Amino acid sequence: ERTMTKDNNLLGKFELSGIPPAPRGVPQIEVTFDIDANGILNVSAVDKATGKENKITITNDKGRLSKEEIDRMINEADRYKSEDEKQKNRICAKNSLESYVYSMKQSVEGDEMKDKISESDRKNRILSKCEETIRWMDNNQLAEKEEFEEKKSELEKVCMPIITAMNRAGGGVPSGMPGGMPGAGGGGGKGPTIEEVD
């Protein structure tokens, strides 16, 4: 019932290991939840690049809560709903900033853009602002949603004019750019796709 995993009842856990190192955002892990008619939960995770897989089966006797415990948790979920929503929005803003800064950094460090942006703009403006933002994030993990949004806006103000000028000069938008172009919906993404299977 709750947004944060720490506030829910743990039924079991497993680890998917052996994923090769890759740039942030590159690994794709497909997680599938399947509940059968008997209440047995099967969870599997597959690394799409390597095919490595792990799974767990949770029978309906593991981690069972009493009726009173379930009612208590539902009441807590209702009581903390607005706090949970605020926390969720804060984390989404943090993730959006983090995704944007690392995507921008990776894009301007890549070969595709090195020749299209001046060394001064690349190093002294974009990469410098990215590093400053990363340091700020490291020191402000518990910042509010508005603070994360403000930092993203500051970074976009530095990056947008340079990328726009590159586009006007015929450079085109590199494929790794967040949202196709900074500020164009970069960072948040669509989120997970959930498919229901009978």
UniProtKB/Swiss-Prot annotation:
InterPro entries: HSP70_C_sf (IPR029048), HSP70_peptide-bd_sf (IPR029047), Hsp_70_fam (IPR013126). The keyword Hydrolase does not apply. Residues 170-198 are annotated as: Disordered. It comes from the Eukaryota. SUPFAM superfamilies: Heat shock protein 70kD (HSP70), C-terminal subdomain (SSF100934), Heat shock protein 70kD (HSP70), peptide-binding domain (SSF100920). Keywords: ATP-binding, Nucleotide-binding, Stress response. One of its GO terms (molecular function) is ATP binding. Residues 170-191 have a biased composition (Gly residues). Pfam families: HSP70. Disulfide bonds: none annotated. Belongs to the heat shock protein 70 family. PANTHER family: HEAT SHOCK PROTEIN 70KDA. This is Heat shock 70 kDa protein.
